[in-house]
Regions:
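C-terminal substrate-binding/catalytic lobe of Rossmann-fold NAD(P)-dependent oxidoreductases
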Residues: 2-52, 68, 132-249
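ADP-ribose/adenylate-binding Rossmann-like module
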Residues: 76-94
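Rossmann-fold dehydrogenase core element
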Residues: 83, 98-114, 131-137
């Protein structure tokens, strides 16, 4: 059996924008083979279709379903033998705990596949040692009604709880406070996905501004995970933890 046959892939949410991008990307590689899709909106015949996430034959399931169904899907996938790559910021803490117990296979949970977002989180963690105040502003397209974004919540919870927030002027879609951090949300079609982290101390400020202009930006993070797939073992959470060894901070 050759290397291609060793890595067959099912994409859950394969008819969505990211699912289609990832399908095309996997088809461009020699070491993974796209064989199946799970998505109620998929009407094609090129791939095997799964109505439910049961009796899975593929080696890997890449999960890109909406946050509204992601935890329900993972509950089903826990009963399979497939290795999992989960690309959602909507996985709840209970499901994370369950995933951690599956030590017999690869479980890779990546809330955000943007490499820029991963570096922003790493740098923010380091900056929090030298600044006493921080706030987060996240901007997304108008179709994203939930706020704050999962990426912003994840970052706020990662930063030390003893760092507070400063006020920010403006007309915002929502303002929330998570782990004592203010998160300011904007929704407008002039944005795809942006996040700014503003640090302040007594004498200076430092801003980390990250902007995604095209969903293809997420493919680089997927490339990183698939390139390192054979080396990753057990449970892995966050792209930043996978790439952290590349930089000394």
């Amino acid at each position: 059996m050759n290397e291609i046959a060793q890595h067959t892939v099912l994409i859950s949410g394969g008819a969505g924008s990211m699912g289609q991008l990832v399908t095309d990307y996997i088809n461009s590689r020699d070491d993974f083979t796209m064989t199946a899709i799970h998505d109620p909106n998929y009407e094609g015949q090129e791939y095997k279709t799964y109505k439910t996430l049961t009796n899975i034959d593929e080696d890997i399931v890449i999960e890109f379903s909406p946050s509204s169904v992601i935890n329900e899907n993972i509950e089903l996938l826990l009963n399979s033998n497939a290795n999992l790559i989960i690309g959602s910021s909507g996985v709840n803490s209970e499901m994370i705990s369950k995933l951690k117990t599956k030590t017999d296979r690869k479980i890779i949970v990546i809330p955000n596949f943007s490499i820029g977002s991963a570096y922003q989180k790493l740098f923010s963690t380091t900056l929090s040692e030298n600044f006493y105040s921080v706030n987060i502003t996240e901007k997304h397209h108008s179709n994203k009604q939930d706020a704050p974004s999962g990426t912003a919540i994840d970052l706020a919870n990662t930063l030390p709880s003893n760092i507070n927030s400063h006020e920010k002027d403006g007309d915002f879609y929502q303002i929330n406070n998570v782990n004592k951090k203010n998160i300011y949300s904007l929704r407008d079609d002039k944005f795809l996905a942006e996040q700014q982290v503003d640090f302040v101390n007594e004498y200076e400020s430092f801003n980390l501004d990250h902007k995604v202009y095209d969903r293809k930006a997420y493919l680089y993070g997927i490339k990183v995970v698939l390139d390192l797939y054979s080396d990753l073992e057990g449970f892995n959470l966050g792209l930043e933890n996978i790439i952290a060894k590349k930089i000394n901070i």
